[in-house]
Amino acid sequence: MLIKVKAKPRSVEEYVKKLGEDFYEVAVKEAPERGRANARIVELLSIYFGIKKDKIKLVAGETSKSKLFQILGEKDQP
């Protein structure tokens, strides 16, 4: 599954908000330097979707606030 993400680096609080069927807003406290914000976005998405971090791949938008991620696999079963 592909999802579009609007990144909000240097936010006061961290969250994942669903804005559309495949469109999310992700706020992180990390600055957009040396991939730190992207790494934190992957962590938050893994928690949100209940999957491992290695199942989330950044496809496009490495240096942009508009990003495209590929989510691989299904949710982990509790």
Model-derived features: positions:
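N-terminal first-folded block
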Residues: M1-A27
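Short loop/turn motifs enriched for small/polar and acidic residues
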Residues: K8, K29, V59-G61
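Compact, glycine-rich, soluble single-domain proteins
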Residues: S11, E25-F49
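Short histidine-centered beta-strand/loop micro-motifs
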Residues: Y15-K17, A37, A60
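C-terminal structural segments of small proteins and small subunits
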Residues: V42-E43, I47-P78
